[in-house]
């Protein structure tokens, strides 16, 4: 009986355990293509990294407050190779709270990094013409609110008899740390081109 109880407990544990699935692209990563795309050119991509706080439905409001990337935030630039396209499509299709899509360690090495300044600005210089993917994680302090009953008011009739009570609520605001992934594809068509973007 004891063995059955232990076995049943283990089975229930596996059923309710939140499994984390991990996927990797199955396309061959050609480091020669990636290295060639990241070799020196005369083009520049510069921009500003910012984000907006998501609402209760997980959507960033159009007219919401912008939170600029803090100084020192890393912005990564990846060359868009066939391997990267496969990675991006898999991430778009499969990634959620239980599933993560990763690049191989070797593919992740082929990128250029830039740091943001005090106003969230960044710059990538000496790029060749080609298609690139830029990504950053913008950390910010978000705000939320909740209501709490802080008292009540009693109502009496004209003769002084008690009729009913109504709660009095007060709204409290608090801040919490949040982060959003911001990304964009950028294509440089001519050598010497300057692209200005907003992430």
Where are these regions (language model features)?
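Bacterial Sec-dependent N-terminal signal peptides
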Residues: 1-21
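Primarily secretory-pathway and cell-envelope proteins
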Residues: 20-95, 143-199
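Short, acidic Ser/Thr/Gly-rich low-complexity loop/linker segments typical of extracellular
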Residues: 83-89, 98-119
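Short, charged beta-turn/beta-strand-edge "cap" motif at the junction between a beta-strand
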Residues: 139-140
């Amino acid at each position: 009986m004891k063995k059955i109880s232990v076995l049943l407990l283990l089975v229930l544990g596996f059923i309710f355990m939140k499994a984390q699935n991990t996927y990797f692209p199955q396309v061959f990563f050609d480091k020669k293509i990636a290295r060639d795309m990241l070799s020196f050119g005369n083009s520049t991509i510069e921009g500003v990294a910012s984000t907006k706080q998501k609402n209760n439905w997980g959507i960033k409001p159009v007219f919401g407050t912008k939170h600029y990337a803090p100084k020192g935030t890393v912005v990564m630039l990846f060359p868009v190779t066939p391997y990267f396209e496969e990675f991006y499509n898999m991430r778009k299709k499969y990634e959620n709270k239980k599933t993560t899509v990763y690049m191989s360690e070797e593919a992740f090495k082929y990128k250029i990094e830039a740091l943001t300044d005090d106003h969230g600005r960044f710059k990538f210089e000496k790029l060749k013409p080609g298609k690139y993917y830029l990504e950053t994680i913008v950390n910010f302090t978000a705000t939320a609110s909740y209501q709490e009953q802080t008292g009540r008011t009693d109502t009496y009739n004209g003769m002084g008899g008690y009729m009913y009570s109504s709660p009095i609520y007060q709204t409290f605001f608090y801040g919490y740390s949040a982060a959003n992934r911001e990304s964009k594809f950028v294509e440089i068509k001519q050598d010497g081109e300057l692209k200005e973007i907003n992430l």
